């Protein structure tokens, strides 16, 4: 395996170091290349993501990312110039966000004993919607300012994400929920609903449901156990996945995959928490989400046994840690030792 590592900013290098520690135990011999991308490079050279680096990244099997963002860089510069550009250049059309409440982890929800287990996955479209940069503004700063952000939804883009979601549902509990707002967003909503129904005919064993996005947020709080696989567009997915993380114990336990399902380009795996510059360098950041991202990476590459071993080690750690607060390195060492 050839792995590109982008540790990034803030706590990124700290949590990635522990993720790599676990990877080395479960999958020895990985060929790793570190890439200096983020605020430090931006300040030193003015570069964000050179074309030459993108070309090099394409030669790898996967990318492991830490975190991007620093208060010394204007908001949006690194996010659009690095994160979003990687997603578009490498065609990461699927953003995969598992949501599971692990034994030993407390949810902010007042869950009743006997409630269904919280274990779902969100398949979010990653390269379309309102994040394509299709918009503009005129008369900026005046009382007559007009601003637009156009949501782009293509049949090709929707179909490939929906099909991936059905495939995942077949490997899970065979239930898929489309989340959208087709009573108001009638054009895009119609495309999504018709596509789900059409492709759903190829998967008769998968039970299909639909929820407006506002209803989905309610049910994710009141009855999250009803969900198995959720498929949704870029914007709605961006919102409900963070709610899902909170329901499952916090964003510090949320892993993600930015995936090119065609495998033409390397997919990228990362914890979804930010760079947390306020605690960077203190050795107190929780690397669990970064380690869980390694599990997603291994599973994507077909190394299912190694991925399962990481999952079990993380589950065992979370089940026994209680209220103990461990240093970053100690968490990595404990999970690695469990392997």
From Swiss-Prot:
Pathway the protein acts in: Amino-acid biosynthesis; L-leucine biosynthesis; L-leucine from 3-methyl-2-oxobutanoate: step 3/4
Phosphoprotein among keywords: no
Gene3D superfamilies, sorted: Isopropylmalate Dehydrogenase
GO molecular function: 3-isopropylmalate dehydrogenase activity; magnesium ion binding; NAD binding
Binding residue positions for NAD(+): 274-286
CC annotations in GO: cytoplasm
Cell compartment(s), UniProt: Cytoplasm
Site annotation Important for catalysis: residues: 131, 181
Function summary: Catalyzes the oxidation of 3-carboxy-2-hydroxy-4-methylpentanoate (3-isopropylmalate) to 3-carboxy-4-methyl-2-oxopentanoate. The product decarboxylates to 4-methyl-2 oxopentanoate.
PANTHER family found in the cross-reference section: D-MALATE DEHYDROGENASE [DECARBOXYLATING] (PTHR43275:SF1)
Family: Belongs to the isocitrate and isopropylmalate dehydrogenases family. LeuB type 2 subfamily.
Subunit structure: Homodimer.
Name of the protein described by the UniProt record: 3-isopropylmalate dehydrogenase
Protein species of origin: Mycobacterium marinum (strain ATCC BAA-535 / M)
